[in-house]
Amino acid sequence: MSKNPLDIIRDLDEELFKGVQLSRDLAFKEGALSVKEKYLIAMALDAAHGASDGVLSLAKQAQAAGASKKEIMEALRVAFYVTGAGSIYTAAKVLENI
């Protein structure tokens, strides 16, 4: 993966960075939902918010956690249903890279 976009936060405010990392660790730890499912949810949310870089990063992390391209697309179907076409256009910008 490329450089962590939060490196600048770590450099400027290490305490804040540690808090963000703790929050991320809590959100993505194995629990009632698998890590794969959590990455798929986060990816769909990024698609809904127009964050194409996040879609790409989270799709790759979901794949690393065992998600198939079909599972990625099904998660995007849910985002499309809830938020409309914008989420699909956001995802389309980056899906060729997974």
Give, region by region, the residue ranges found by the protein language model:
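Residues within well-ordered alpha-helical secondary structure of globular protein domains
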Residues: 22, 44, 78-81
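Amphipathic, charged-and-aliphatic alpha-helical interface segments
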Residues: 39-52
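Mid-chain, well-packed structural core segment of small domains
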Residues: 50-76
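Short runs of predominantly hydrophobic/aromatic residues within well-ordered alpha helices
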Residues: 37-40, 72
